[in-house]
Amino acid sequence: MKRAHPEYSSSESELDETIEVEKESADENGNLSSALGSMSPTTSSQILARKRRRGIIEKRRRDRINNSLSELRRLVPSAFEKQGSAKLEKAEILQMTVDHLKMLHTAGGKGYFDAHALAMDYRSLGFRECLAEVARYLSIIEGLDASDPLRVRLVSHLNNYASQREAASGAHAGLGHIPWGSAFGHHPHVAHPLLLSQSTHGNTGTSASPTESHHQGRLATAHPEASALRAPPSGGLGPVLPVVTSASKLSPPLLSSVASLSAFPFSFGSFHLLSPNALSPSAPTQAANLGKPYRPWGTEIGAF
């Protein structure tokens, strides 16, 4: 029994040594794993920071592209016209910008920073919007279809006026800057050929008094372009502008003219005022006798 005790003690000491060795190895492994664990968060944080910086740079780049495209959409007239009707893609905006720059380049290399030319573009856009609103008002509010004589006359006059001012703006392009005040003066303009032919045909079939014919002859001599567009002194439409039954007689349709109009100075001188007889109380009675609603602006449109 005495011998067994040291053996037991020796085996117990060996177990203690193995336990201590395992503890030391475990401590060493624990230190290594803790070192690896302390290094992995730093590397992962660096990777995350790098990805975050890359995302911020990419977002700033996209913001610059979007801001530039929005500026181009505002500055290019054709893109500015379409931004309310449909959503423009980036490629379409860039294509419109290229087309606009080509147009400016073919115009002589001028107008890149010309404020007047840019204002003329926006005035043409305004006239197109007004033309579209007039057609919309006549169709929705007044209930006039496309074959109505009043709508046909008004649309034909506006289309003809737009083409005339387009040609006039092209003729005045080489004269330099046109002051804004001249756009509101009385510029001569040519009457519509359809209106001229119809008015001359209507005047041959009617008889007028000598005083009225003499007065109209003086007006035609002084202003030959305004003779076919001024309202008759009798207050009614008369035989000056007969009814145009078909819209196919118009040279440019409404949609194509709205898409093809260009810059031109708008002149209020072409829209003549009504005569005093047109505002007399007999005008509502005549309209009531005809069974049509009273439109005081109808006589002014008939003057076109």
UniProtKB/Swiss-Prot annotation:
Bias (Polar residues) ranges: 28-47, 197-211
> Which keywords annotate this record?
Developmental protein, DNA-binding, Notch signaling pathway, Nucleus, Repressor, Transcription, Transcription regulation
Instruction: Show the GO MF annotations.
Output: protein dimerization activity; RNA polymerase II cis-regulatory region sequence-specific DNA binding
Q: Which domain of life is it from?
A: Eukaryota
**What InterPro entries has UniProt attached to this entry?**
bHLH_dom, HES_HEY, HLH_DNA-bd_sf, Orange_dom
**Keyword Transcription regulation among record annotations:** yes
Q: Where would you say this protein principally sits, based on its record? A: nucleus
In this chain the bHLH domain maps to: 49-104
Q: Where is this motif: YRPW motif?
A: 294-297
Q: Please tell me one Gene Ontology term that the record gives under cellular component.
A: nucleus
Q: Which portions of the sequence form the region Transcriptional repression and interaction with NCOR1 and SIN3A?
A: 48-117
| Role, per record | Transcriptional repressor which binds preferentially to the canonical E box sequence 5'-CACGTG-3'. Downstream effector of Notch signaling required for cardiovascular development. Specifically required for the Notch-induced endocardial epithelial to mesenchymal transition, which is itself criticial for cardiac valve and septum development. May be required in conjunction with HEY2 to specify arterial cell fate or identity. Promotes maintenance of neuronal precursor cells and glial versus neuronal fate specification.
Protein family according to the UniProt entry: Belongs to the HEY family.
This protein's name:
Hairy/enhancer-of-split related with YRPW motif protein 1
